[in-house]
């Protein structure tokens, strides 16, 4: 009887986690988490102290913690009952940038700035929201 060498497959099982990690990142402070979803980037704040924009009447879930921008057009404040917080996401060090499908995010000591091809986007931090 012959024995076949076993081939380790555990590395293959980890591939989806690796791909997911490449699609998202967090700020060095651990307060901002961002993730790509198609051609849109979404960033969530864990803690914030600024006044949130008025909640739309049709928003019956969490409001003012999540922001998004696509490759064209204005940024959005999201009505979202979920989160993209992933404590295992790679850290985008201060001074570094992240590019994906027409959106670029810059990690800065003052917060996270994400901008699209139209020059529209947002800047967020614990103390500030600026949509432009």
State the predicted function of each range.
Residues 106-123:
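Short, exposed beta-strand-loop hairpins at the edges of beta-sheets
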Residues 37-38, 46-47, 100-102:
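A motif-centric signal for short, conserved binding hotspots located
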Residues 20-22:
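Boundary of Sec targeting at the N-terminus
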Residues 16-18:
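N-terminal signal peptide c-region/cleavage motif recognized by signal peptidases
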Residues 1-11:
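Bacterial N-terminal signal peptides that target proteins for export
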Residues 41-92, 124-132:
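A low-complexity, Ser/Thr/Gly/Pro-enriched, surface-exposed linker/loop concept
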Residues 84-111:
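Acidic, glycine-rich flexible loop segments
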């Amino acid at each position: 009887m012959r024995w076949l060498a076993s081939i380790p497959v555990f590395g293959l099982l980890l591939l989806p986690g690796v791909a997911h990690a490449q699609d998202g990142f967090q700020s060095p402070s651990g307060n901002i988490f961002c993730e790509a979803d198609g051609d849109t980037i979404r960033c969530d704040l864990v803690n914030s102290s600024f006044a949130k924009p008025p909640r739309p009447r049709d928003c019956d879930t969490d409001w003012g913690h999540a922001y998004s921008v696509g490759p064209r057009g204005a940024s959005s404040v999201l009505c979202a009952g979920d989160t993209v917080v992933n404590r295992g996401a790679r850290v985008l060090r201060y001074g570094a940038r992240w590019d994906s499908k027409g959106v670029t995010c810059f990690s800065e000591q003052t917060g996270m700035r994400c901008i699209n091809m139209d020059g529209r986007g947002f800047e967020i931090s614990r103390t500030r929201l600026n949509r432009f």
